[in-house]
Amino acid sequence: EMCIRDRVLGEKITVKTWPYNFKGFYGYRNFTIEDAEGKICAYADSQWIFMDLKRERPARISDKMLEEYQMEEPFKMDYADRKIKLPEKMQEKESFQIRPEQIDTNHHVNNEQYIAMAKNYLPENFNIHKMRAEYRKAAVLGDKVFPFVYADDKMYLVSLADEEQKPYAIVEFEQ
């Protein structure tokens, strides 16, 4: 989840990030962007999964690795549920295939790319104030993506799904 204020071109900023919790194979991390006076311009919360890269499966973080992290207090904000609920009625849009430039070094779609894809369904005058994303499964090169969009007067919700309508990612934007 992320909230923002408008920035000014050339504005000096400081980006900060810190872990605040680990549970099982989940890691929790906050981010802030501050202006030159230390005022918060943007803040975000993220949840990460610790992976065993050889087995390509989630793994518990080791005690040794936990010792390397210095936990800090979580940022004071409203924390959204991890899962984004899909509305029953969504409008299906034209499908498309995953392209090579959307793939990361792990050979699947980079998480930022899902957000960029979802932004394509926003109207031009939609001013994003808050965004959250739920990543459900990895799309790979050549996969076909079936977008489904829901909109009301305050928000847009985009599900980027496979041919069985199972989401790769769900992205929610609020004005």
Regions found by a protein language model. Name each.
Residues 2-4:
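Short, small-residue-biased leader/transition segments that mark boundaries at the very start
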Residues 8-85, 139-143, 150-175:
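HotDog/MaoC-like acyl-thioester-processing domains
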